[in-house]
Amino acid sequence: MATPSMLPQWSYMHIAGQDASEYLSPGLVQFAQATESYFNIGNKFRNPTVAPTHDVTTERSQRLQLRFVPVDREDTQYSYKTRFQLAVGDNRVLDMASTYFDIRGTLDRGASFKPYSGTAYNSFAPKSAPNNTQFRQANNGHPAQTIAQASYVATIGGANNDLQMGVDERQLPVYANTTYQPEPQLGIEGWTAGSMAVIDQAGGRVLRNPTQTPCYGSYAKPTNEHGGITKANTQVEKKYYRTGDNGNPETVFYTEEADVLTPDTHLVHAVPAADRAKVEGLSQHAAPNRPNFIGFRDCFVGLMYYNSGGNLGVLAGQSSQLNAVVDLQDRNTELSYQMLLANTTDRSRYFSMWNQAMDSYDPEVRVIDNVGVEDEMPNYCFPLSGVQIGNRSHEVQRNQQQWQNVANSDNNYIGKGNLPAMEINLAANLWRSFLYSNVALYLPDNLKFTPHNIQLPPNTNTYEYMNGRIPVSGLIDTYVNIGTRWSPDVMDNVNPFNHHRNSGLRYRSQLLGNGRFCDFHIQVPQKFFAIRNLLLLPGTYTYEWSFRKDVNMILQSTLGNDLRVDGATVNITSVNLYASFFPMSHNTASTLEAMLRNDTNDQSFNDYLSAANMLYPIPPNATQLPIPSRNWAAFRGWSLTRLKQRETPALGSPFDPYFTYSGTIPYLDGTFYLSHTFRKVAIQFDSSVTWPGNDRLLTPNEFEIKISVDGEGYNVAQSNMTKDWFLVQMLANYNIGYQGYHLPPDYKDRTFSFLHNFIPMCRQVPNPATEGYFGLGIVNHRTTPAYWFRFCRAPREGHPYPQLALPPHWDPRHALRDPERKFLCDRTLWRIPFSSNFMSMGSLTDLGQNLLYANAAHALDMTFEMDPINEPTLLYVLFEVFDVARVHQPHRGVIEVVYLRTPFSAGNATT
């Protein structure tokens, strides 16, 4: 476009094209101007031209992306380091926000990878049904016995007494090819054979393997082009059987040895190894292996080194060699990036670029809404014939005073009475199956047992061990907490994101395909706040970064098993850098460069969290944790939550040998789930500072988070959270005080916010002091005896009898009276703002701090009281400060960065 020369050159910095007035009709422009006061069109009709249309002298300036090939690479056992030479030519500006690492490699997700529920092989077979098979007798000298179904009805004949498969074009009989015929999937399609029509002869195939395998989940690979499975160098033998003592054989079976595998099932009821080839081995019970999706973490958390000692990246100008990336152990790069994304976009939408699919869980699994089942109508199943095949009857007719048989009419099958049927409660079965698969299987390991005659590895972090353990029946069942909305207490402290219903992980796993071995081609963004959005001015720079190869850190699995032990490996073959120059004209770029070279126009970047984090160890079963006294100068407040030690890696090393876990890492990805375990926090300063919280409801230096016994009515929302704590969270997150019914706007109530995740719960429980109350053990619970199984995957046991469970709700003698309340608040960091008035953070001075707390250093003590957890945990505290990087590029090839982290005056939070 022709631009009037009077416009300043920097107007081209707006890269979205022409203004509407420059290409729309004069009449439309005049109308827009005349109605602008009450109908503002603004720039709705701006021309979407992106690149400049004049003063562009080279094709390179117009190019969208450039690929930089590394000048040096270092591939070690635990990391892959690359170095790039960034050459930014004159009159150009490199947009660091557009850069990403393009990484190719190969991935072995290990033997524990199973991207589906159930089994892929014979999934409709009963779980304890055997294949057609032979089994040994107690006396090994006696011939093997057979249990089989001869489904292929045909005549036995020919020179070799084979099963006739049909006739050829000359109407001559064709007999079975023993390598694959008769095929096990073939039989009679109608229902009359065997019931109304007599089957004279039939045949099938039988396994003669030395051990028995249930049909459910059994698989054998083909050994010939017809689908036969006979093992190489073995022969098919024919076995003939008849029901009487005389006559021709009625059935023939082609016995073979085959390599039968169970790739996605395991035994949950097994007999001793010595009996598995005998009749006892026929009733072994199979169950599917648990699903285990494996993929890269959300937004590639853990792949690039941050907060990692000497392994941080480098961005340095060749003229000065000053590194713009400063090594700070307690920067929150990954978590800060996760929360920044969640507050700027809808994280419920998945996007394959950058691997964006946030970890989630099914709320119906975390908090069970047990309203029973709608099973008013019975569910029947009927025989295929639709009638009862009764005894064979003769047709008769009246002949004077007697009844006589009708000639040639003796094949009548008459059933008497109602049609026989079987009943199954589908609704109850589906509900209990849901509870078992989604809740019971994820119970803590101390509430599970190893089935008899099953050997599991001693390493409890392996997939084989986790897969082989079964939960005790009765802990999670259809009658537990019936009529209420309640999370099972034993599951509250179990990571709900390590679940096969984590749709984000499932999506990221499926992006890589459904195979254990795969090639990957990924695009990884830079997250470090100081250089993530930098405008890089002309010069030559060294850009270096390291990428982890530890599978537990960069991959995520459903069960959180140790992927190193279970065989997962990653191999990086190439890393390239893609970057874009701003599509500006040379004159515009040079003007922008001159502006940014001036030290008054330095680029400043704030870390999104702007906090110094601390991890304080909490011993198992501890309920009190005092934080050592430390000095402070000024800060905005605290954010805090609780982490499990086994789920928190040591970020300072490329390979943490003690990190034997691959589930979500709350420390990095924000999947917090232990916030509900805090009871109270007390904060004390030295005597020279007055605590700025006298307008709160409770004592000035103590925040009571939840109260179990609430005699004075301090709790809120039918939960055990105090009104005091609820008010503090509303003020800290939304600046909303106690003003009646008032909810935060949508843009404030995103993924990690307080109200978005606050789940209050209430139920009534029996009073143990009531007469007739017995604290029955789990093994004494009668859960529909005879019609279900005692240990959910084992064979059914028992006989019909009344059930033992909670007393009826309507029984006045044993009514559920004692209230029990609690809450969950996953993903949320508790926040305590530091201000004299929680409804206002105060006015900032030109120094960027509130004068109220810009004091000299003072001692600070904090004491936490929390629920006991029987494993080591960590208190995660974010001291909210002002975390700023100021970037100065005074000359060509020179980049200088000053990191300003106020207010701490001592310790590793000081830059």
Curated annotation (Swiss-Prot):
The modification N-acetylalanine is found at residue 2. The keyword Oxidoreductase does not apply. It is found in: Virion; Host nucleus. All late proteins expressed from the major late promoter are produced by alternative splicing and alternative polyadenylation of the same gene giving rise to non-overlapping ORFs. A leader sequence is present in the N-terminus of all these mRNAs and is recognized by the viral shutoff protein to provide expression although conventional translation via ribosome scanning from the cap has been shut off in the host cell. Its main location: virion. Induction: Expressed in the late phase of the viral replicative cycle. One of its GO terms (biological process) is symbiont entry into host cell. One of its GO terms (molecular function) is structural molecule activity. Keywords: Acetylation, Capsid protein, Cytoplasmic inwards viral transport, Host nucleus, Host-virus interaction, Late protein, Microtubular inwards viral transport, Phosphoprotein, T=25 icosahedral capsid protein, Virion, Virus entry into host cell. The keyword Acetylation applies. One of its GO terms (cellular component) is T=25 icosahedral viral capsid. Belongs to the adenoviridae hexon protein family. Homotrimer. Interacts with the capsid vertex protein; this interaction binds the peripentonal hexons to the neighboring penton base. Interacts with the hexon-linking protein; this interaction tethers the hexons surrounding the penton to those situated in the central plate of the facet. Interacts with the hexon-interlacing protein; this interaction lashes the hexons together. Interacts with host dyneins DYNC1LI1 and DYNC1I2; this interaction might be involved in intracellular microtubule-dependent transport of incoming viral capsid. Major capsid protein that self-associates to form 240 hexon trimers, each in the shape of a hexagon, building most of the pseudo T=25 capsid. Assembled into trimeric units with the help of the chaperone shutoff protein. Transported by pre-protein VI to the nucleus where it associates with other structural proteins to form an empty capsid. Might be involved, through its interaction with host dyneins, in the intracellular microtubule-dependent transport of incoming viral capsid to the nucleus. This is Hexon protein. The gene is L3.
